[in-house]
A protein has these predicted regions:
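A short beta-strand motif characteristic of beta-propeller blades
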Residues: 17-30, 60-67, 99-105, 143-149, ...
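Conserved blade-register residue in beta-propeller folds
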Residues: 55, 84, 93-94, 135-136, ...
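Repeated scaffold domains used in trafficking and secretory/extracellular systems
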Residues: 31-38, 69-80, 108-117, 153-160, ...
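Short loop/turn segments that connect beta-strands within beta-propeller blades
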Residues: 57-59, 96-99, 137-142, 189-192, ...
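Sequence/structural signature of beta-propeller modules
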Residues: 1-33
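Non-cytosolic head/periplasmic domains of membrane-anchored proteins
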Residues: 62-171, 178
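Short beta-strand elements that form the blades of beta-propeller/WD-repeat-like
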Residues: 36-48, 54, 75-87, 92-93, ...
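Extracytoplasmic/luminal low-complexity segments enriched in Pro/Gly and acidic/polar residues
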Residues: 172-272
Length: 272
């Protein structure tokens, strides 16, 4: 783990030095007419379209274009790297700003991926005996953690890593008595079992998970946003949408912005 992280950091530093000499400027034309995802990548950004992936440097220079030929492509970003995968497919690629670092095929269809700041990657796949399997790869692509979510645990639909690259939150959904049930598991790659558990109100669907700092996880659900203690899973604060619908959410440090719509109006809610 430590060796893989050190090698990754050395490679990222070498990339940064080389890329600083690439000419570029803004506004930048990406060449992608049907963007699906746009994520910040080490000061630049990566843009995913239905057929192409474009990587740009901090100065607007176009660094590379990838054509993965996936039916349902998705990306997950971690500072200078990103995971490129085919949802419901089995191919996973770890990409840097300058090239492909790692390619593998999973035993079952990929449901979701997430990446920590140092390139640690969590991969959620289908499983024939469990709701899903979660496997965590370190920056050197060795498996360091596995978790099998039972049917009562639910299927992971949201993941979020802490800045220590070791802890993560997994938001899982299942059906209970005809309603959606959301459970949030607080995990540590050094522990065999989940560290803590939070169960949302019946009918509340987990959408996003963010670590605001080392001890607080923001869980964004379909009807509210809750702040959780990362050690105990206890709810420490809550904001209910009051019947409005969530359009978007953003975090900056410990601040949170929620964009809500309802009754023909839009509201921007700032939380601290």
């Amino acid at each position: 783990g430590a060796l893989g992280a050190a090698a990754a950091m050395a490679g990222d530093l070498a990339d940064s030095v080389l890329l600083s000499f690439e000419p570029g400027s803004y506004p930048a034309s990406t060449g992608i007419s049907d963007p699906i995802q746009i994520q910040e990548l080490a000061g630049g950004f990566v843009e995913l379209g239905s057929t192409d992936v474009a990587v740009f440097g901090a100065n607007g220079a176009k660094l590379r274009t990838i054509q993965p030929s996936y039916a349902r492509p998705a990306i997950a970003v971690g500072n200078t790297r990103f995971a490129l995968y085919n949802r419901a497919g089995t191919e996973l690629r770890i990409e840097s700003r300058t090239g492909t670092l790692y390619t593998t095929r999973t035993d079952a269809g990929i449901l979701l991926c997430a990446m920590s700041p140092n390139g640690t990657t969590a991969v959620v796949t289908e499983h024939n005996r469990y709701a899903a399997a979660v496997q965590v790869l370190d920056p050197g692509f060795s498996v360091i953690y596995q978790w099998y979510a039972t049917q009562s645990d639910g299927t992971p639909v949201a993941l979020g890593f802490a800045s220590d690259n070791r802890r993560f939150a997994a938001g899982c959904i299942s059906a209970v008595d005809g309603q959606v049930s959301s459970r949030i598991f607080l995990m540590d790659c050094g522990a065999d079992d989940p560290v803590a558990l939070y169960e949302a109100d019946a009918g509340s669907l987990i959408l996003h998970l963010y670590w605001l700092d080392s001890q607080h996880v923001l869980a964004v659900l379909s009807d509210c946003a809750v702040l959780l203690d990362a050690s105990t899973g206890a709810e420490t604060a809550r904001y209910d949408y009051g019947g409005a619908s969530l359009v978007d959410v953003d975090t900056a440090g410990s601040g949170v912005a929620l964009l809500l719509t309802g009754g023909g109006d839009a509201s921007l809610i700032l939380l601290d």
